[in-house]
Amino acid sequence: EVRKMRNIKIDFNKSLKKVLLAYAVIFLAGIAFIFIPGFGVKLDINFGGGTKIAYSYTGDVKDADIEDTVKGVLDKSFTVSKSTSLAGDTKTFEIALVGKNSVSAEKQEELTKALTEKFSDNTIELYNSNSVSPTVAGSFFTKSIVAVLITALFVIIYVGIRFRRIGGISAAVTALCALVFDVFITFFTCVFFKLQLDSNYIAVVLTILGYSLNDTIVVYDRVRENERLMPDSEISDVVNVSINTSLKRNAITSLTTFVAVMTIVAVSELFGLSTLRTFAVPMAFGIVSGAVSSGEGIKSTISSM
């Protein structure tokens, strides 16, 4: 016990209130950004329905010229984004209309003709086109939420059974609360960076749930072991020692993963790959949140048992 107590480097008892206050500030700031003009929740056509039309081109085309041409054909709200293939041999721009702003086949042909005439020197060609009805999008969104809820249910069952010695259901609820906060962090990241919520976001959420839960279980294992080795110690001291002894392992794992994800972010920004960006950016923030919440979330609940 004496040897383990010497391993304490950070007193999480003192930092708990500050961390919880920081959580509250981040949460309120995230909620506020939802209602700030220009930010808000932006749904991809997979969740909100609509149409995406992509064109390949050569040379350089200005966003303003694309927007002016599209406005001359479509009297609907839209966004334009550019991307370049990793090999650098294919440039595309995508016109997205979300919600009920779908585009008929006739209008797509008219738009293609207008763009071809406007950028006659840029070899404009239709790259791909995709439309999703609001009904289908709503069904996909519902199924995605159900998948996340089922995952949360299995988390409660698994953690509750495996760690019944250190709280059982209380331990499971603690882990779930930490996971919920991590999900909110990824959501607020999308709002702040004006990223569309698409199928990539669901992949991020499910990945973060598994990643953060793994960190939490590592600490729980330490708590269970140290509770047996330190029978005369207060539970707060046991938890404090457990977090510190697993801190190096979790920090190295999180840092390694974070660097890898930030590499993906850099590539997505360099080549304008929006699909990679909507995955990597919230993933990076989710990793940081998961590393913090796996320790402080456990501390906040187990210490009060």
For each of these PLM feature ranges, what is it?
Residues 1-305:
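A structural signal for conserved, well-ordered secondary-structure elements
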